Amino acid sequence: MAKTVAYFYDPDVGNFHYGAGHPMKPHRLALTHSLVLHYGLYKKMIVFKPYQASQHDMCRFHSEDYIDFLQRVSPTNMQGFTKSLNAFNVGDDCPVFPGLFEFCSRYTGASLQGATQLNNKICDIAINWAGGLHHAKKFEASGFCYVNDIVIGILELLKYHPRVLYIDIDIHHGDGVQEAFYLTDRVMTVSFHKYGNYFFPGTGDMYEVGAESGRYYCLNVPLRDGIDDQSYKHLFQPVINQVVDFYQPTCIVLQCGADSLGCDRLGCFNLSIRGHGECVEYVKSFNIPLLVLGGGGYTVRNVARCWTYETSLLVEEAISEELPYSEYFEYFAPDFTLHPDVSTRIENQNSRQYLDQIRQTIFENLKMLNHAPSVQIRDVPAGLLTYDRTDEADAEERGPEENYSRPEAPNEFYDGDHDNDKESDVEI
């Protein structure tokens, strides 16, 4: 049976700009939405312009001092915040840019609203490609991330769900989410990422397993350069299958960072768009309520292709290999296809022996789990908002203009293949 899919897109989120030459480009969200729109995928989803998160919402996880700083600081007054900039790790990699707090409010609100709708059974799957900023910590920014929308969304899910499983397929370790839930068995975190050679953020060893009540509820899959579709699948599917079997989550949050694709400007993996999408499709196959988020991804045209393809998988709608014409069509030159060859010459350093060793260690750790930890019954806290689906127009009756307002960001357009030539060592 087809799932009900809610899709969250803020038409202004693509306007924000981290600064000249910065690898993180919110404009990729406008490209993604444009493809979703022109493929007609919006007809298969309930489309929402999302809620904007308040300071109070953000302080569910972050410190009040940090969030107050994010709201107050701007490029024009930042000289007066020198001490705070250092204290909160805001600077080169996490710059102060115009509308910083508003940007955080928009992507965080969408994840929070997605979680609320899953709680209220308005949808089976909620999609927020603007979210997934997994490095942000309680007291500081990190790796292009300011507010950890994932943690805030999971905290909302925990009002209704006894056990939430978090899966991260970004090339970078999901350190902010792991740190937030390191001591609890209510959330199990599973991260597949590049590890070693001082690769950011430097955490995510296989032996980081959680502590106290959360011991063995943190699972890391450290990978080496050049992993391809076959090797990734050899680990991903059996590991996730075992985790779901042992943990029995009642909800899943999936972070779909697209920097694990081949040809990503800041990545070193060799996944194809189909291989990346196969992970999403596999997680969907468990038929467990699912919050799908974005994350990293720095070759803009491939990020848009990847997340559009994964949207099509989530709504179970086949789409053509030829990209539909749109205002961003020239971004996808010279092939104008959905699945270009993104393989690189990076050698796959993940031998079958190495992958089998990881899998064996992970399975041994899973045996240490108590099956499906129980939660004491108590009153459910008030939800974020109350939704009435009758307020939504039928997808077939909505025109594209009701679902999409094109952002205009003249300073955000694609600068060519060398606009950020791997000089930064901090990424999502």
UniProtKB/Swiss-Prot annotation:
Q: Where is this region: Disordered?
A: 388-428
Main location (coarse class): nucleus
Q: Is the keyword Transcription regulation assigned to this protein?
A: yes
Q: What does the record say about activity regulation? A: Inositol tetraphosphate (1D-myo-inositol 1,4,5,6-tetrakisphosphate) promotes the histone deacetylase activity by acting as an intermolecular glue between HDAC3 and NCOR2, thereby promoting its association with the N-Cor complex, a prerequisite for the histone deacetylase activity.
User: Which key words tag this protein in UniProt?
Assistant: Biological rhythms, Chromatin regulator, Chromosome, Cytoplasm, Hydrolase, Metal-binding, Nucleus, Phosphoprotein, Repressor, Transcription, Transcription regulation, Ubl conjugation, Zinc
Return the EC number.
3.5.1.98, 3.5.1.-
Give the family, as the similarity comment puts it. Answer: Belongs to the histone deacetylase family. HD type 1 subfamily.
Q: What is the designated name of this protein? A: Histone deacetylase 3
